[in-house]
Amino acid sequence: MIDRFPSPLRLLRSLLIASLVAFPAVAAHADKPATIRIGVAQQGAGDPPTFGGSSAATAQLQQLVEKEFATDGIKVQWLFFKGAGPAVNEAIANKALDFAYQGDLPAVLARSNGIRTRLLLAASVRSGVKIAVPPDSTIRSIADLKDRRVSIFRGTNLQLVADNALAKNGLGERDLRVINLDSASSLAALASKGIDASVGDYQLYKLRDAGLAKIIYESQNDGPQFTRQTHLLVLDDFERAHPDIVQRVVDALVKGAQWSSDEANRDALFKLWAKSGVPYASWQADFANQRLKDRLSPLIDPFLVARYKAVAQDALKLKLIRQPVDVDGWFEPKYLDNALRAQHLEHYWPRYDASGKPLS
């Protein structure tokens, strides 16, 4: 006979079992972050702010991370820092970010100070440093910079490449009158001839094309050892608490990297990045004679690891840090490997050895 009216004890037991079954789902939902905070180590342009030059920029402009979490009710917040890498490090130290896009040297500086993060993937690699001077300047080469007023944004990944380029020419920062300026201030100072030279990035092409500067040096022409790398990192605490979220963020950025690396999209890519305020022509110049797959590869290959080890060693040699930084174990490739497999991209990007030569 069917018991149509269960006893109070049986009803209580049924409710208790139901609540225990439901509890893990409720707990898991409550454990999701309300917002994913991604720091960007540069000043954004526009409203809302955007940036360019990397697969992370593509992901932000195409809202790939936002689309990934649209059905979860999780917001994605991109936070831009005029103070670049050093300012991002401060935000990381204050637990104000979950992820960050920044350059190699700032991350090494943070690690030397005990900030615990994991490097998830490369966002842009083999990026050159440019040195520009006023158009009527008599400066023709790095050797001519001795005793000149030169702006360098210290603590960013521009600094170390510039220091190595100076060393190759028998100079150091002490041989120059170095002025520490952020990117915007440096561009303004160069345009007004308030300085004799500026160490910068692709933004210097805009001044050149406007007739306000000439570029006397591009570090990528000296080989991959004179380039800078950027990455996406995650804070240790966030990764331990939300590995599933980390995986999905990496999935989204790998999608952006694949689209950005497709030569069929070169024109569309530079037009997309031009929304950041950097002209299309500047991106053309910055990526001239380089394959998109080489510049926008997310791979954690021997070349990338070697460059971070070199940055750590050079930073110690130049006394930018006080103690050695261990790079081994800093990278966490499992999320990238999962994304590459899921998107059938295991062999899409070429891998390079520590010296920058293709692996067979």
What is each PLM-predicted segment?
Residues 101-113, 163-164, 168, 195-215, ...:
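A ligand-binding cleft/hinge motif common to bilobed small-molecule-binding domains
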